[in-house]
From Swiss-Prot:
Main EC class the enzyme belongs to: isomerase
Name used for this protein in its record: Trigger factor
Compartments reported by the entry: Cytoplasm
Record GO cellular component, one term: cytoplasm
Gene name in the database record: tig
One Pfam family recorded for the sequence: FKBP_C
Source species of the chain: Pectobacterium atrosepticum (strain SCRI 1043 / ATCC BAA-672) (Erwinia carotovora subsp. atroseptica)
Residue intervals of the PPIase FKBP-type domain: 161-246
Domain of life: Bacteria
Catalytic activity, EC: 5.2.1.8
Domain topic, free-text comment: Consists of 3 domains; the N-terminus binds the ribosome, the middle domain has PPIase activity, while the C-terminus has intrinsic chaperone activity on its own.
Main location: cytoplasm
Catalysed reactions listed for this entry: [protein]-peptidylproline (omega=180) = [protein]-peptidylproline (omega=0)
Length: 434
């Protein structure tokens, strides 16, 4: 076997392989001998068909199969010999071939980039230092009560915390626009569901009043014909309702899995959940900064085949989220996923090099901690832990998570880390908007 390797462009490679005629003929003869033992041809007993008859009947197809097999096997041998690391499916191109002669073919493919990590010491990371305070727990308890609140009609003026039932008609330059009119529309205030200024215009008015508010549609509004336009809304306020928060009774508290129904037990459970969320938020905040720094410090060429594969994964995930099928997933525009796919591939290559160069292996103790942390959010944590321990695929997925964490921590150990005190709400709001 003769092999030559050339670079086509960037990460592209072309391997040219020549297989000697005697290798081909030996393989063809061997396959014909095997075929002669199995084929059935009228006039001959099974296994007694003369070789010349077998060759005449099956020679062409056997030779074709042999050439296909030799192409694949010799390519594998070639890349092992040349220490080439291909990515994606190779593209085989057979050359001209005459029976009894040598066979030359080419294989084109991309290779993984050579990654040499640099700039780790220059990565800057701001690590949040956060404590869950009693005031944070109070705020979370208020949120839980609001989620379970009932509504009671009131005759006072509307506030930003109320629920309003309205009729409205919107117009631009005196013309009512499509989608700008509704009756008995129930609006929970303070959730920013409407365009800026709409809810503010309702505050201070009472049920039974009719009034007009002036607002501007945002420049990035989803409807093209309304972007940046000034509009007027005539509003009839039909009903104002205020929240009635439930008391922290034993019955109410038990809904949240606190067996003894005590306020102390509820506060302890809420604090535990908040601290678990906080730990994850801090970890993700630090991880994002580490990965951003790693990407910015290491500009690497990315194989198109890897990006294509990641785009397919993201397409299928998007289709599953919205109830679509695989065919619909493949029809989603590539541009929707290309940037995210490239980032994921780059992160994978860089962290892969961190893992390889530092000879990292998944820490089983860390794997167990990760499973326990995840399981603690379920009603029966032990059942979840046992389920993971018996599921090899899930266990390997968690090992990959642990290994990624270890790689991030390895980079973090070399980075410039500055601690910054922030409040629980500040950090969680940053996490939500990131």
């Amino acid at each position: 076997m003769q092999v030559s390797v050339e670079t086509t462009q960037g990460l592209g490679r072309r391997v040219t392989i020549t297989v000697a005629a005697d290798i081909i003929e030996s393989a063809v003869k061997s396959e014909l001998v095997n075929a002669a033992k199995k084929v059935r041809i009228d006039g001959f007993r099974k296994g007694k068909v003369p070789m010349n008859v077998v060759a005449q009947r099956y020679g062409a197809s056997v030779r074709q199969d042999v050439l296909g097999d030799l192409m694949q096997r010799n390519f594998v041998d070639a890349i092992i010999k040349e220490k080439i690391n291909p990515v994606g499916a190779p593209n085989y191109t057979p050359g001209e071939y005459a029976v009894g002669g040598d066979f030359t073919y080419t294989v084109e493919f991309d290779v993984y980039p050579e990654v040499e990590l640099k700039g780790l010491e220059a990565i800057e990371v701001e690590k949040p230092v956060v404590e869950v305070t009693d005031a944070d727990v109070d705020t979370m308890l208020d949120t839980l009560r609001k989620q379970q609140a009932t509504w009671k009609e009131t005759d006072r003026a509307a506030t930003a915390e109320d629920r309003a039932t309205i009729d409205f008609t919107g117009s631009i330059d005196g013309e009512v626009f499509e989608g700008g009119k509704a009756s008995d529309f129930v609006l929970a205030m303070g959730q920013s569901r409407m365009i800026p200024g709409f809810e503010d215009g309702i505050v201070g008015h009472k049920a039974g009043e009719e009034f007009t508010i002036n607002v501007n549609f945002p420049e990035d509004y989803h409807a093209e014909n309304l972007k940046g336009k000034a509009a007027q809304f005539v509003i009839v306020l039909k009903k104002v309702e205020e929240r009635e928060l439930p008391e922290l009774t034993e019955e109410f508290i038990k809904r949240f899995g606190v067996a003894d129904g005590s306020q102390e037990g509820l506060r302890a459970e809420v604090r535990k959940n908040m601290e678990r969320e906080l730990k994850g938020a801090v970890r993700n905040r630090v991880k994002t900064q580490v990965l951003d720094g790693l990407i910015n410090a290491n500009d690497i060429e990315v194989p198109v085949a890897l990006i294509d594969g990641e785009i397919d994964v993201l397409r299928r995930q998007a289709a599953q989220r919205f109830g679509g099928n695989e065919k619909q997933a493949l029809e989603l525009p590539r541009e929707l996923f290309e940037e995210q796919a490239k980032r994921r591939v780059v992160i994978g290559l860089l962290l892969g090099e961190v893992i390889s160069s530092n000879e990292l292996k998944a820490d089983e103790a860390r794997v167990n901690v990760l499973i326990e942390e995840m399981a603690s959010a379920y009603e029966d944590p032990q059942e979840v832990i046992e389920f993971y321990s018996k599921n090899k695929e899930l266990l390997n997925n968690m090992r990959n998570v642990a290994l990624e964490e270890q790689a991030v921590e390895t980079v973090l150990a070399k980075a410039k880390v500055v601690e910054k005190s922030v409040s629980f709400n500040e950090l969680m709001n940053q996490t939500t908007t990131a």
